[in-house]
Structures are given as C-alpha cells and as structure tokens.
Amino acid sequence: MAEAMVVEDRPAEAKRFFCHMCNVEINIPNSDFTCPLCANGFVEELPANAPEMDSSTAGASGSARSGSSGSGSSGSHDTLSRGSSSSGSQVNVESLRNDIVSLLNMRNVPNLEITIEPNRRHSNVLHLGGFGGPSGSDSARGLTAGGRVRPANLDRLDNVLFDFLQSLPLAGATAEIVTGPGGGGVGGGGNSHMFFMGNPGDYAWGREGLDTIVTQMLNQMETSGPPPLSAQRINEIPNVQINAEEVNRKIQCSICWDDFKIDETVRKLPCSHLYHENCIVPWLNLHSTCPICRKSLADDGNDADDEFVMLDAFGPEMAADGSNSERRSASTATGTDNPSPANNPSQAAAEGGRTRPDANPAQAARNNIFTFDDDNMFLD
C-alpha cells in the first residue's frame, strides 16, 4: 500500500548578518555583502539557530538617551539617535565622524556645532545644534532605530545634515565638530575639533550644488569676451583658395576639423589662419578674435592713430602742449640752456593771455589740463 507523501512548502528564512565594523546585526538588501551603514564588507552570516537580538532593549535605551538629551539641551538641537544591539556594542564613531567631515569638506557653516559622543554603551548620538537658530521644543526630535538595523527606515546622514544646514540663519558664526572619548580624532588623539565659519548658502553642498555653480559659470562665460566683429570688417576678410601644398600639409579647419580640399574657397584671417566661411562667420558675429590665437580683428594695432584720436578729442591746446614737450626734450638733448616759457607756469599763463585775448573763458576753463614730462609738471 503506497503511503501518501505530504510535502510542506515552507518559506525560506531570511539570512541574518552581523557587521563587525558597526557591531550590529543588519539585513543586507544587496548581493555584494556590504554593510548598508558603513559600506564595509566585514560582515558575517549568522547561523539560523543563533538567538535573535532583542530590539526592545536597545530601542528603549536609545529612546531614553534621546529624551535625556532633549531635556538637557537648549531646545535648538536636532538629534539623530541610532541604537545598536543590547550586547553593549557601539556604532563606529570614527567612521561616522569621517562621513561628516567628508560631507562638509571644510565648508564654512554658520552657527553650527556637531557633536558625536558615545551614548553609554548601546548607541551613539549625533547632535546637530545651531546657536541662534530656529527655536524648537524642549524635547529634542529623535530618530531611533533599535535592534536590527533596517536601512529603509534610516535617513542618510548627508540628507540629515543638508536639511539642517539649510535651516540655519544667515548670521555670522562658529561651527565645531567634536568627537567624544573613544572617537579617535585626527592624529590619534582622543578629541578632535574642527571649526567652520560662513554662510552655507554661499557654498555648494553635494553634487547638485556643484553642478549648479558650474552651470552658472558657463552661462556667464557665454556673455563675456571680446565684442562681435562688424559686418563690414567680416566682409573685408579675403577669400583664398586651397592649393596642393596646403592639402599635402593636412591643413584643417580648426572649427569643424575637416580637411581642406584643393581649390576650396576659405576665409583667411590677418593671422594667416584658414577657416570655412560657414564656420568662421558665426564665430565672428559673437567674438572679434581668431578662435586659435585670439588675435583681435577689430583694430589695426596702430598706436599713432589712437594718439591722434585722443588729441583731437581734447582739442588743439593739448596738441600744442604735446609739441612744446617735444621741443623741451629736444633742447635738453642738445644741451641748450635757453629756458622755455612753458617751464615757468606764470610766464606761460601771461603769454597765453597775450596770444589768445579773444579766447572763450568757458573754453579756457575747460582746457585746464595737467601735462607731464620727465622733469616738470605744469598746468596749462
């Protein structure tokens, strides 16, 4: 007689792990066997018959710590309390401190005090305090996760810090990161202090903030630089044809990076750089320089013309002063000791009155110009 076999389908038990860096039992939702808290791989799979850690004890301990911390604070502290197991182990304070320092990255933060201290033996408490910040209730707001740590129920540390820094006032300030006993500060000391000053709104926090700053800088660069070249000057740029020698030299258009073809018509700038017309004209409509050497195409580089323009703008009197200065320099070079009237301000003024009796007083007042040479300074 055949016996009936009854097979009972039992759900597979979830695997349990223990992180030796955080000293806490964890659930690993990924396949690379890394702790979701410290991102380290120093984890151990617990046997199925191992006693499960009591979460009520650690949760009560963390809640008690949150309550006592809130009652003893000034009311302007946000508290993030993560309770661990009841076995008396602690979350690695050094790892937590490094996360905060890496996040802040020496940014200036006003009115900030960050304290990491051991909570007896069962948890670590992170105090985020802002002196002069928005006042809160007498009891601190706490986030507690005791016993088995579930990453889905824990906010990331950088999000908590970001939200807190955004709520800080704009007053000037001090900030301090203090690691409590056993925290293992920088250089192996027991306590470590780091100070920050400034306004967090003036800095980029996280990748999105950095992208925003870079985007703003690029937008500003688009509107800066030399002015556009006039259409008349663009039309004056000569058209030349590519010869066989230039083709053999593999000359390219530096804008589109296409090789020039023989007998192809291109534009040749004064700096001898060659471009396709449909490539260089849009550039010159925005910038009056060569894209390669940045040579300006707006001016001819004639300093004499610029000097004449300045003299014409200030009037013939300044031009006469310039000629007098040249004559004084020439007489000095030839060793002539004959004093010039221009070297004596009173004599120059008297002669000016005699030679220009019909001068307009308003025009004369407008033409009071200081003139400098190597040895003298006088007022015309």
UniProtKB/Swiss-Prot annotation:
Which stretches are tagged as biased composition: Low complexity? Answer: 55-68, 74-89, 338-350
- Ranges for the region named Disordered are 50-92, 317-367
What EC numbers are recorded for this enzyme? 2.3.2.27
Provide the catalytic activity annotation.
S-ubiquitinyl-[E2 ubiquitin-conjugating enzyme]-L-cysteine + [acceptor protein]-L-lysine = [E2 ubiquitin-conjugating enzyme]-L-cysteine + N(6)-ubiquitinyl-[acceptor protein]-L-lysine
Which segment of the chain is annotated as a signal peptide? none
For this protein, the record's SUPFAM superfamilies field holds:
RING/U-box (SSF57850)
InterPro entries membership: RING_finger_E3_ligase, RNF126-like_zinc-ribbon, Znf_RING, Znf_RING/FYVE/PHD
Q: Which GO terms describe its molecular function?
A: ubiquitin protein ligase activity; ubiquitin-protein transferase activity; zinc ion binding
Alphabetical UniProt keywords: Metal-binding, Transferase, Ubl conjugation pathway, Zinc, Zinc-finger
Q: What is the effect of changing residue 253 to A?
A: Loss of ubiquitination activity
Pathway where it operates: Protein modification; protein ubiquitination
Q: What class of enzyme is it?
A: transferase
Function, as annotated: E3 ubiquitin-protein ligase that mediates E2-dependent, 'Lys-48'- and/or 'Lys-63'-linked polyubiquitination of substrates. Recognizes miRNA-empty Ago1 and triggers its degradation via polyubiquitination independently of the Bag6 complex. By targeting miRNA-empty Ago1, eliminates dysfunctional Ago1 not able to bind miRNA and thereby plays a role in the quality control of miRNA-mediated silencing.
The extra comment attached to this record reads:
'Iruka' means dolphin in Japanese. The name was chosen because dolphin preys on the Argonauta octopus, similar to Iruka 'preying' on the protein Argonaute.
| Name of the molecule in the record | E3 ubiquitin-protein ligase Iruka
Species: Drosophila melanogaster
